[in-house]
Amino acid sequence: MLLSKINSLAHLRAAPCNDLHATKLAPGKEKEPLESQYQVGPLLGSGGFGSVYSGIRVSDNLPVAIKHVEKDRISDWGELPNGTRVPMEVVLLKKVSSGFSGVIRLLDWFERPDSFVLILERPEPVQDLFDFITERGALQEELARSFFWQVLEAVRHCHNCGVLHRDIKDENILIDLNRGELKLIDFGSGALLKDTVYTDFDGTRVYSPPEWIRYHRYHGRSAAVWSLGILLYDMVCGDIPFEHDEEIIRGQVFFRQRVSSECQHLIRWCLALRPSDRPTFEEIQNHPWMQDVLLPQETAEIHLHSLSPGPSK
C-alpha cells in the first residue's frame, strides 16, 4: 500500500514503462545528470503510474524514491514560474515542499526526451495509516487526536500554498514510527486551489462529498472538510462510515465503536450535508475535542515505540 501511494505521482493511463537504467537525460540540462547524483536501486513497483525505484542520494546517502513517468501518459499538465511545462503534480509538490515537514517532499526532478524523473524523499521506517489501522483496529482517541491534528495542519499548509489535495484518505498518510510525525502524500489528484466551483474530481469516491455525488460540483475547502470527517471516523471506528453513493447522500452517521460525545459532534459537523454548515479549519482546531493534543514525539513514545513496523510495501 505504501509504495503504491508514493508511486502515484502523475495521472497516467496504464502502459508499460521504459527501464529507468537504460534511458539517458535530455541534452542541454545544466545540472549534473541523474546517474551521477543518485544510486538507483531495485524496482519498487510499476504499472499505469510509471515505474518507481528505490535509490540513494550519493552526496549524503539519503534514501529516495525515483519515479519515472512517460510524457505521453501524463493527462494533467502545469507550468512552472519560468514557463517550463511539467506534470501538474510537480507544480503542486514544488508549492508545498518547502518549509513544512507534514507533506512528502519533491527533492528534484529531471526531464528526459520522452519522460520525467521525480526524486522524492523516502522516510524510514514508515507505515501508511490504512495499514496501521488495518493491523491495529480503531485508534485510541488520544492517538487519533494527535494524528488528526497533524493531517489538518498539512491540509491547511497546502491551502495556504494554493494547493487542493483532493484525495485525503488513510492510504495517503504516512506515519514515521520513530518520530510520531505524519506526512501527506500522493498529489496526483490535486489541483490549484480556487474559490470558484470544481466540476472534476479524480480522488477516492467514498471520501468525496455528497454535493459531488449528486451534482458533480463542489467547492474545494468544504469538500476537504468532508474528507477530513471521513478520515477522523475511520481513525476512531476502524473503517469508513459510507461505502455506497446513497449512504453518502443520506449522510447518516452510525458509530460502530464507543466514541466520546465530543468526537462524535466534530465528526458529524464535518459531515454536514450542506457544505456551508461544515466547520472551517480554525473551527475544527478550536473544537473542544481538539484540545490537549500530544506532540508528535510524545505520540511516538506513548503509542508507537513499542510497535514493530511491518515491511514496506
Curated annotation (Swiss-Prot):
Binding site for ATP: 44-52, 67, 121, 128
Top-level lineage group: Eukaryota
Annotated catalysed reactions: L-seryl-[protein] + ATP = O-phospho-L-seryl-[protein] + ADP + H(+); L-threonyl-[protein] + ATP = O-phospho-L-threonyl-[protein] + ADP + H(+)
Result of altering residue 53 to H: In a colorectal adenocarcinoma sample; somatic mutation
Domain (Protein kinase) ranges: 38-290
InterPro entries: Kinase-like_dom_sf, PIM1/2/3, PIM_Ser/Thr_kinase, Prot_kinase_dom, Protein_kinase_ATP_BS, Ser/Thr_kinase_AS
Listed EC numbers: 2.7.11.1
Chain positions found as Phosphothreonine: 23
Active site: 167 (proton acceptor)
Entry-linked SMART domains: S_TKc
Enzyme class, first EC level, given as a word: transferase
Any one of the GO BP annotations: positive regulation of cardioblast proliferation
Entry function: Proto-oncogene with serine/threonine kinase activity involved in cell survival and cell proliferation and thus providing a selective advantage in tumorigenesis. Exerts its oncogenic activity through: the regulation of MYC transcriptional activity, the regulation of cell cycle progression and by phosphorylation and inhibition of proapoptotic proteins (BAD, MAP3K5, FOXO3). Phosphorylation of MYC leads to an increase of MYC protein stability and thereby an increase of transcriptional activity.
Subunit structure, interactors included: Interacts with RP9. Interacts with HSP90AA1, this interaction stabilizes PIM1 protein levels. Interacts (ubiquitinated form) with HSP70 and promotes its proteasomal degradation. (Microbial infection) Interacts with Epstein-Barr virus EBNA6; this interaction upregulates and stabilizes PIM1 and induces cell proliferation by inhibiting the growth suppressive properties of p21.
Name of the protein described by the UniProt record: Serine/threonine-protein kinase pim-1
The encoding gene: PIM1
